[in-house]
């Protein structure tokens, strides 16, 4: 479904209905992966969509069509620990495929612009 080049030169891939997120090196080696379920949690991976690399090196992952018992978005560390979850099934249902979390200069710029709107 989606892929992005990471700061370290690897590629992070959201597999859509493949129920996984995979980091692949330029040499085509899998260096990080979550598949089916986040280890040590009850979070099931469904239709994996958008991806974002945070400034701290963590990943934010979209988990569309996950149903009411799983988050639609979550942040995960390289140690595969969930930092936070967004689970608002009542609000977005299974339709939250893409999103963007703003931080740093980008967040400041958008915040400044929003303050000028009336």
Where do the protein language model's features map onto the residues?
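Histidine-/acidic-rich catalytic cores in large beta-rich domains
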Residues: 1-118
């Amino acid at each position: 479904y989606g892929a992005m080049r990471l700061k370290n030169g690897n590629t992070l891939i959201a597999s859509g209905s493949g129920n996984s997120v995979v980091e692949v090196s330029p040499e085509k080696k899998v260096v990080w992966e979550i598949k089916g379920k986040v280890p040590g949690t009850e979070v099931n991976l469904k239709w994996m969509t958008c991806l974002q690399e945070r400034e701290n090196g963590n990943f934010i992952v979209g988990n569309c069509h996950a149903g009411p018992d799983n988050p639609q978005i979550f942040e995960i560390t390289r140690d595969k620990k969930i930092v936070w979850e967004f689970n608002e099934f009542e609000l977005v249902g299974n339709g939250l495929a893409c999103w963007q979390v703003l931080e740093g200069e980008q967040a400041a710029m958008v915040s400044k612009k929003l303050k000028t709107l009336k």
